[in-house]
């Protein structure tokens, strides 16, 4: 194959074609057969290198070329091999960047294909398991016996009918049947009239004697309500007419018997209890005691009530002896059953004895019924918190629990109705992200972690002292490095580069700890629990049943944002440590340079204090212990204000002392010196030294404020170059120069605190024949301003040559005030378009001071261009320039004139002999 077709090991190798084609042509069958184990379907780079560069060679063989192949091996390494005539020998790897990038992509693709294959196999296995489970589910459903419709036995229907018949008997008093005749009707009418007259007479006597009782008042109110709210012909009167023959117990037992037959799980026991309570006469007093009974004590109560029907004294004796006998003969039971049985026997004794007393004294058991209800209510109010009694042994282990919630042995269908009742509340949804969870596996055990940002967050005790941990995510295992562990029980693990979670959790910006959600992996199953939490400093506590492996789980709010990291495991309660954004990064310790700077500042402060109080500094002795003094906030504020006032005063004095040479009077606005080059402009001169500049910055003056102050000073003391033209002078055009006349400003001046002072180029000054002495600078008296102006005008008229004016004080305005005559002309579309510059060409001062007026003028300009009516434009521009003049800014009409028209007597740029600038 020498000098034949190029050799390619695979299609990707041919597509990439890395290296030398000549080297590929040198491949022989022997070389191909002995090739190293490169990655299948991967490219290689072929090089044809001089032999002497690889092997120690002398003579003519030095310049012979050999084939070198570089590629990725199956063991994951990268290497280069050269053929020495017999076999391939590994040499130092040659770096081919494109080849290395391609191998990385191929390796990643192979890894993804392997994951896909494993996932597909797992999916097929799970699908098969699901099918098996579905078949098993169907088979088990067929084995479950179908519930048959409930059938009520005929004997219970007969017993219920008998009880219903007994309850419908009005009473035990028989009434004789009387034949109604005209005489009997007259007797009944007379009897009714006599009773009514008697009631009226009694009422009048009571009113006369003022002997009205509370019962009389209640009867009167009842009659008023009866006649006021119930009409004379109403169905309620008919119902009450028939009901008043029956007692309340009869009606209640009728309803209870029907409910027992229809809904009770044990109708026989319930109906027998109703029958015995009716026969014994205890009636309503029996019902409140039923929750205290067990099955055995319930039958004891029924037996004693039947015995009471025949012999009340025997029943009372047995009822009193029942608790004593139960304590003795039931001691073989376990504690929980023993307590329940004794409690039922005591309730039976109270019922029999108290019921007999009430029947003997009052003839009814209503008072006993009220007493038992009151006791139950008090007991219920005192045990609202606890839900069970725990019985413990000597070691403190709970061996049994007795629920405080009373369960009925009889008539339990009410509780079933309550359980199947209508819900009264709606629970809120919570957001969970299972894709953000992973399992942290260490030699000590397993824990839960979650992805947040570029880290995996878990509990520090789940990581232990390990530097590297295994992260299990979606069935795959990754090795990750522990990045940082703060003082809290939290660990931050760097997320591996090839691990890409489907979801990440974010920290809560506004934490709400009222309701928290804990989600974790336990035995490869996702568990989620929601509970109310309490904050204890930097920790949370909540009632959640926790298990091993939940350490490091996220504790989130209802929106799925992280609040804390789950920590403790007590079985019934959970705890977590609150996580903050500051916990993600370690607090950097100050460097040695920063510590030295702080020490220097402290020493400077001590030196300044010693300089201010030299006597104290000399006589002060070192004190071993310092007295602690309590200082209020107001004292601290006063001290800070005093210190700031002193520092600002010192700062003002220093600035005034430094800038005093530059705060000089300005020259008057004349045209006498236009042809003369101004001197002493101090171009490129440093206004302050670097030490003074830093000192001002340390005093509290920031850089931006300081630069603004320097710009203002420059604007007050410098301006455009002024030339002296002896041949030109116009008294009427005294206000010609607008830009640069009232403010002397040199745009070429450079403020530089680091560069050296440039050397100004020499200038040729036009000699003067009759120089006049300059007058000394005097402060301007505002009261004599008009007189000086008149004198100045007279001197200008008399002189044959323009003279210099006296320096004028600094003015906050720019140029001359706008005059209406300058704006009163015929405006056209071009004038309207170019009167305002583009928005990006406006200065910051224009936007701040004239922003609203500029927007208004733009609106007027747009309207004028659309309607071709420019009558309102002059007044608007005049108002804008007037506002600009008052703010110390240049008018916009003046800017247009300055831009379109060069200044008079402009002689072009000045010629200097400075260094040339070479541009590349």
From Swiss-Prot:
One of its GO terms (biological process) is viral translational frameshifting. It comes from the Viruses. Changing residue 747 to A: No effect on viral replication. It catalyses: RNA(n) + a ribonucleoside 5'-triphosphate = RNA(n+1) + diphosphate. GO terms for cellular component: host cell membrane; membrane. Residues 783-795 have a biased composition (Basic and acidic residues). The keyword Membrane applies. Residues 753-813, 900-920 are annotated as: Disordered. The record marks 175-176, 419-420, 664-665, 755-756 as: Cleavage. Cleaved by the viral and host proteases. The protease is probably autocatalytically cleaved. Cleaved presumably by viral and host proteases. GO terms for molecular function: 5'-3' RNA polymerase activity; serine-type endopeptidase activity; serine-type exopeptidase activity. The modification O-(5'-phospho-RNA)-tyrosine is found at residue 693. Keywords: Covalent protein-RNA linkage, Host membrane, Hydrolase, Membrane, Phosphoprotein, Protease, Serine protease, Transmembrane, Transmembrane helix, Viral RNA replication. The active site is at residues 461, 489, 551. The chain crosses the membrane at residues 239-259, 286-306, 313-333, 344-364. Residues 800-813 have a biased composition (Polar residues). Its EC number is 3.4.21.-. It is an enzyme of class 3 (hydrolase). Belongs to the astroviridae polyprotein 1A family. This is Non-structural polyprotein 1A. The lineage of its organism: Viruses, Riboviria, Orthornavirae, Pisuviricota, Stelpaviricetes.
